[in-house]
Amino acid sequence: MIAGATAPSSQHEILIASNLIKKPSTSQNKTPTAQSSSGNNGAADGAPQGYHHHHHHHRHLWWPRTTDHQYWCVLRKNQFAYYKTRDEREAISVIPRFDILNFKISELDGILTVYTPSKDLIFKFPRGQNEKVGMELMHNWKIALEKFLSSPSGNESVTTGSDYDEEEDDDDLIVVDEKAGPSSSKHSCSLTMDEQLSREDKEFYRMFDPRNAEHQVCSGILYTKVKKKKLFNRAKWQKFNVELTNTSFNLYSFKTGKLKKSIKLDKIIDCIELDNNSKMKNDDTNFALITFDERLSFKAANDQDMVDWIINFKSGILIRKKLKAENI
């Protein structure tokens, strides 16, 4: 199904979702040197630049029936994910927008290939009630993927001004040890674990359990301050692709995807909303992440994103406190 109209500002807006049959992924021995443009619109020769075409030399793709697994696949503005079933809340795998290089749909074989730096994800479209239904599903996925690739990596809110700098340099340093300031009571997240569990189902909290295999909880775009050597170490707000898993919080270069900083969640003490200046619209979505030895200030795209990030961090902190109290 192609999603209906939703709020355009939502990074998690669903572009399309349907059942697809997954083939075991194929690894790439060589990472592409450049991201292919979406101008090929998923055509047969639309593999990302830097890929060899050795995996496209067969007219028909081999499909071992013993490995057929049908998953509920969801394409959002900022990520592609697939789930065991439509009702599952925890994804088997989530690939952020900046990790998806290109796609290819083979109408002859009914196969969708999604290219990432490390592997190719291959899915087969299930047979519809008739050929027309099957072709319509492929067409809808093609339209959704073209829209997905034509947008920037995630649905970011572009912020301008003298305190912002979109240019990245290898010697930029993320600013730490800032004064976090008093927390605001506007969005209080100081719930006990028992209160949280009584309000949410336990399956949701399994997402934050650090004992589980590492998996993505959420991802998006946040601004944080960096010291710019070219500006004599003056601090500027700069945007990063960020990812929160059940074990770590990672900041990646918005332009290159290179990991810039990783924080183990065991080191995080608290996450608080800063005492934001309501008179300045651009300064009312700031929050701070506090660890044992540093503090980092972040700016979200909007108020709801800020609240979501705080709640996600708080949830991870709370479940760790519970496990520690139970000596698990």
Curated annotation (Swiss-Prot):
SMART domains: PH (SM00233)
Single GO term (MF): phosphatidylinositol-3,4-bisphosphate binding
Traits of the deletion mutant: Increases cellular level of phosphatidylinositol 4,5-bisphosphate (PtdIns(4,5)P2/PIP2).
Topology of this chain in the membrane: Peripheral membrane protein
A cellular component annotation (GO) from this entry: mitochondrion
UniProt GO BP: negative regulation of 1-phosphatidyl-1D-myo-inositol 4,5-bisphosphate biosynthetic process
Domain of life the protein comes from: Eukaryota
Major localization class: membrane
Any matching Pfam family: PH
Region (Required for targeting to the cell membrane): 213-328
Keywords: Cell membrane, Cytoplasm, Membrane
Signal peptide: none
Bias-annotated ranges (Polar residues): 24-41
Quaternary structure and interacting proteins, as annotated: Interacts with MSS4 (via N-terminus); to negatively regulate MSS4 kinase activity.
Function: Binds phosphatidylinositol 4,5-bisphosphate (PtdIns(4,5)P2/PIP2) at the cell membrane. Negatively regulates the activity of phosphatidylinositol 4-phosphate 5-kinase MSS4.
Other notes: Present with 1560 molecules/cell in log phase SD medium.
Free-text comment about domains: The PH domain interacts with membranes containing phosphatidylinositol 4,5-bisphosphate (PtdIns(4,5)P2/PIP2).
Protein name: Pleckstrin homology domain protein OPY1
Species for this entry: Saccharomyces cerevisiae (strain ATCC 204508 / S288c)
